[in-house]
Amino acid sequence: GDGVINGRGKVFWDKYRSMRKEYDPKGLRWIVDYDCERPRGILIAECENVTVENIVLYQPGFWSLHILYSKYVTVDGIIISNNIEGRGPSTDGIDIDSSEYILVQNSNINCNDDNFCLKAGRDSDGLRVNRPCRYVVIRDCIAGHGDGLFTCGSETSGGINNIVAYNMTGMGTKYGLRFKSTCQRGGVIEDIYLCNIEMIGVRDPFVVDLNWHPAYSTSKLPEGYDEKNVPTHWIKMLTPV
């Protein structure tokens, strides 16, 4: 509790943008996020009984708070401000990923991608791990700048279910309720309960996109590359579903 974490992310934003200029023309948009290796602001992985409260996060290199393969985590009263001294790419707010029994409350997020987001792994690796995101409550929260007050996906392979979100406000957020995935992801989204969601100046209140961002979501090795001579994590991404 109490304090500020400055991720000093600009150096990583600049690195990512530089790599995009190199990778995109080669048909490698799908792997650049992984090759860039941008750090998260806070990563809670394989943990139980964790509380994060009353802190301020800003300028992360990548996602601000990532809860991964964890359970019994409470996030209470945090502020995320990712638009100080620039706007970093894909600087999500809170990402709850293949985790369960999570409570997020009394938090305020301004970011440059999804504000409050649920994920469950992607593609063949997500199907292999097969860990759902479930039993999550998000309440009494505000989203300002960002791409999704409440988002499911695009990583949906393990499934997302038994989610409750209420007393949430989007103020100038690009999207309100956003569900996104692709045919490569798989997984089922079900039993999502949303109540008392207020949107002020939100461009699109409700969006469902099941062919989200094909250049990023579809992993394909361009001509001229030999699968025997690429990094191991490329092979994992290239494994067909």
Where do the PLM segments sit?
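Extracellular/periplasmic carbohydrate-active domains that bind, remodel
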Residues: 1-241
